[in-house]
């Protein structure tokens, strides 16, 4: 039945996933957001190359590489607003393994499938 969890313990959150039939619209604009800096625990960590001082990507925004290969939806944002760090999480090692060689690659957000949080509202 699995490990016993205490009342306040946060169990491993399930990562959001895109609909199976999702495909990047051919003419959808993509914009650079950061670079893959680490791959840990079924997650791809992206250091933003753009300050988050005015806005940061909202969870569920769709990320991809320059060649338009889909990385996945944004799972969480952490770090300082000046240098936000984004995390895309996978629910299976198989999904994660597909990206094991992507360290150092530029990451983009899909403009029509992404939203921002303006930092004035979270400061």
How does the language model describe each region?
Residues 1-30, 123:
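Long, compositionally biased charged/polar stretches
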Residues 94-123:
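Helix-rich interaction surfaces within compact, conserved domain-sized segments
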Residues 2-8, 64-71, 116:
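Proteins with a high burden of low-complexity, intrinsically disordered sequence enriched in S/T/G/P/A and R
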Residues 25-97, 101-104:
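Short beta-strand/strand-turn micro-motif
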């Amino acid at each position: 039945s699995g490990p016993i969890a205490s009342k306040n313990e946060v169990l491993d959150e399930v990562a959001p996933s895109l609909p199976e039939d999702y495909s990047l619209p051919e003419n959808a604009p993509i914009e650079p957001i950061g670079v893959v800096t680490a791959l840990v625990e079924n997650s791809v960590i992206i250091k933003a190359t753009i300050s988050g001082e005015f806005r940061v990507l909202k969870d569920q925004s769709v990320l991809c590489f320059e060649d338009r290969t889909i990385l996945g939806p944004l799972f969480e944002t952490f770090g300082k607003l000046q240098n936000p760090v984004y995390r895309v999480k996978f629910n299976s090692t198989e999904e994660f393994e597909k990206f094991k060689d992507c360290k150092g690659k530029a990451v983009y957000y899909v403009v029509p499938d992404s939203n921002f949080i303006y930092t004035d509202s979270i400061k």
